[in-house]
Amino acid sequence: MGDVIVSISDFRVSNNVGDILVTYALGSCIAVAIYDPKVKVGGLLHYMLPDSSLDVDKAKTTPGMFADTGIPLLFKACYSLGAQKKSMIVKVAGGASILDDTNFFRIGQKNIMMARKMFWKNNVLINGEDTGSNCNRTVRLEIKTGKVFVKSSGGPLREL
């Protein structure tokens, strides 16, 4: 019970109404929060890179590092706790341009586009989004309510 920390390149799921899934220091990374209100099951993924083809070996050992391997695993883990795709509420945050002032690598932008592409291809609606800009974010998912809160560096905690 309480805060369950989701590290970079990892995900957590829960059906414990006392849990709050939290991930910190989202820069160019993306947090994907999913929640099924019918069964009160939620999950939070903190991925770093858009595409596992960048490092196939790493994707095998750390699938949460990549959007294309982490997002499907997040959904499957929630399904194993009774969640259903048709009931899922999906919220996305992150994808900032923190250390890339010239916007040369555009990792944040590529991460955002991969999430949108994957959800679109799988007929999943993104219900809330706080992406881009140049600020770090913290994301919290309350399992009891399904509410997702985002705190940008220097800003207040607000519901997404």
UniProtKB/Swiss-Prot annotation:
It catalyses: L-glutaminyl-[protein] + H2O = L-glutamyl-[protein] + NH4(+). Disulfide bonds: none annotated. Keywords: Chemotaxis, Hydrolase. Its EC number is 3.5.1.44. One of its GO terms (biological process) is chemotaxis. Transmembrane segments: none annotated. GO terms for molecular function: protein-glutamine glutaminase activity. InterPro entries: CheD-like_sf, Chemorcpt_Glu_NH3ase_CheD, Cytotoxic_necrot_fac-like_cat. PANTHER family: CHEMORECEPTOR GLUTAMINE DEAMIDASE CHED-RELATED. Probably deamidates glutamine residues to glutamate on methyl-accepting chemotaxis receptors (MCPs), playing an important role in chemotaxis. Belongs to the CheD family. This is Probable chemoreceptor glutamine deamidase CheD 1. The lineage of its organism: Bacteria, Pseudomonadati, Thermodesulfobacteriota, Syntrophia, Syntrophales.
